[in-house]
Amino acid sequence: MTVNYQNLKLINKELEAFPRSNLLIVSKNQSQEDILELINKGYSKFGENRVQEASNKFTTSLRKKFNNINLHLIGPLQSNKTRLALNTFDTIQTLDRKKIISEISKEIKKNKNIRTSNYFIQVNIGLEEQKSGVSPDELYNVYEYACSLELKIQGIMCIPPNEPNVEKFFIKLKKLRDNLDKNLILSMGMSADYKPALKLGSNIIRIGSKIFT
């Protein structure tokens, strides 16, 4: 795959109407060469789905050379990858259970020099069995638990069902955020549905397949 700069330019143009929104380039399965090309063109915010793959591509030497890189984990976090994730990512967007929150808290106590500083709670907004995330009813309890362990919860994220009326799920996530804390960031919207997500208040859109074609 190669970077589709025409699509990238179009997305950036669309974002001009939403000054509080940012693009997170989803670079899973992409080469370090393509990532470096984007970095050299001024892009710094990337999302990866797998901890080991991200660690292999966004090496210590790369991070030292380009210290403005902001790397987000947007895939599930397994307990046995907690330490590596905390030393690889600036933000983890996929807190989906108390157990992983507890594991993160334990690692932080062992190592004060971890990289990760911000966290999002993933909400299973469509209550789909095959998807990770806390249910909407569990969100407040999990949020309070994370805060009690002094994790900095920056926002909430979702991956909605693949349905025509995706707007209703974005509206629901926004309402959940407003009831929890209006200052929290909304991470919602991907290649197929980022336009309605932006209109409904998304602060972070996660785009991969529209950029790498």
What are these regions (language model features)?
Residues 198, 209-213:
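Expand to "…catalyze enediolate/carbanion chemistry for C-C bond making/breaking, isomerization
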Residues 1-184, 190-192, 200:
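Conserved alpha/beta-domain cores
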Residues 159, 207-208:
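Thr-Gly-centered strand-to-loop micro-motif
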Residues 203-204:
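Divalent-metal-activated hydrolytic enzyme cores
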